Structure formats: structure tokens, C-alpha cells
């Protein structure tokens, strides 16, 4: 989902910064859209890496007006077979990674009194689904987070949105 979102944004003339743990496919886009595209190899579980990449993006582009959190991790096991460490790991990427990202970008948006944050979620965060309890739980938590942040930052003209893409075949 993310790669094609990036391609479309760049093709439409937007400046794009990407924080991703896997960057090999991004080199192709960098060669084509050099001045409008930067990327950083970042593990969203690492506060310092996230903050450093966001700070560099703001310095390079001068503004962060739209931010999309699209990272996710999903495991496929029954709930009884899923240990707590798996839950913690999936939450650390999907939910706490989103929170780290927001905490890094929000100062730039509040300074400009403008911004839009989009979280990629899933219908299973609302309905639930078998054999992906950690993933579904994180998406439900993201839904609640977006609602809370939408209220808290309305005064700063910063909006928070949830995107529910259709079922896709992706590596997560």
C-alpha cells in the first residue's frame, strides 16, 4: 500500500519523506524523483530514530503538512497460540509506532496551526477477525487514538483521519 501511495504522491508533484524499516524499493523512486523525495531507514519502535528522521524532514522541506502512518505488522495464529511477546511486538509497531510518529510531527504542525494526519487502519479494528487478534487490537486502538487526537488538536487546525483500504496482498 505504502509504495504505491508514495508513487502516486510523487507523480502528482508532492514532496514526500518516508520513514521505513525496509528501504531497498525506495532507491528506484529516489532516482526518478530526486529533489522531491527523501527517505530514512527507521524502526518505528525506536524513539530517537523516528524523531531524527522527522526533524531532518522538517529541515529539508521546511514544513510537514500531511503525515501518513502506514506501518504495520500482522501475525497469523489463533489467539490461544499467540504469546504476550507477540502482542507486545505488534502493538509496538502498529500502535506505539504511530504514537511515536505523531509525537514527533505534532510540534511542527502546531507551530503552523495546520496539519493532517492519516492512520492506515483496517475494518478488522472495528469488527475483529479470527487468527489476527494482535493486529485487530492495534487497529482498534488506532481508531480510538485518532478520535482522541482529533478532539485535542482541533484548536490547532490539525485533523486526524482513519483510512480503511480494501483487502490487499502485502508483506507485513
Regions found by a protein language model. Give the residues of each.
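Canonical Rossmann dinucleotide-binding motif of NAD(H)/NADP(H)-dependent dehydrogenases/reductases
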Residues: 1-16
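Active-site-adjacent segment of SDR/Rossmann-fold oxidoreductases
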Residues: 12, 127, 148-159
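The beta1-alpha1 cofactor-binding region of Rossmann-like NAD(H)/NADP(H)-dependent oxidoreductases
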Residues: 42-52, 84
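Substrate-binding pocket helix/loop in short-chain dehydrogenase/reductase
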Residues: 78-79, 83-91
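Active-site loop immediately N-terminal to the catalytic Tyr-X3-Lys motif
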Residues: 80, 129-133
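Active-site helix of classical SDR
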Residues: 102, 138
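Residue(s) in the substrate-gating loop at a strand-loop-helix junction
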Residues: 122
